[in-house]
A protein has these predicted regions:
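Short strand-coil-strand connectors
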Residues: 25, 68-72, 93-95
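Double-stranded beta-helix
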Residues: 91, 95-124
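A short, N-terminal "cap"/entry segment at the start of jelly-roll beta-barrel domains
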Residues: 1-42, 48, 122-124
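Short, conserved beta-strand element in jelly-roll/cupin
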Residues: 50-67
Length: 124
């Protein structure tokens, strides 16, 4: 059985956020800890409508996030289980921890845009 632990050894530190990631049955599972306030607006540039087009399911285990859609916004807090349909832009508070499940194939385009935009913002 494939599994991932929140304390597992494969930690990726992106400066603003630390993430442990595994692929399980066609889904990417992330344990994320936000170290600085994160507004994903700039990171999602270049995607359709400059919004994440990958659906996500998860739980906020600590902190909160604000998720903006074209026609409304939602706040998700500690203990809340969420579904983010395509077309969202999240913002995370410092100290927020989430466990998130995303279809791996759909997440690929989002991850590529984030890495490209992060490199551009860092001047690399």
């Amino acid at each position: 059985m494939a599994h991932i632990s929140p304390d597992g050894p494969d930690l990726a530190d992106y400066g603003l956020v630390e993430v442990r990631t595994a692929e399980l049955g066609g889904y990417t599972v992330d344990f994320s800890t936000v170290k600085q306030p994160v507004d994903m607006t700039l990171m999602l540039r270049g995607l359709p409508d400059d919004r994440c087009q990958c659906p996500h399911w998860g739980i906020v285990t600590e902190g909160s996030m604000l998720v903006r859609y074209a026609d409304h916004e939602e706040t998700v807090g500690t203990g809340d289980v969420f579904y983010m349909p395509p077309g969202h832009v999240p913002t995370y508070e410092v100290g927020t921890r989430i466990i998130q499940f995303s279809p791996t194939a759909e997440l690929k385009a989002t991850d590529e845009a984030i890495m490209r935009n992060l490199a551009a913002l860092q001047g690399t």
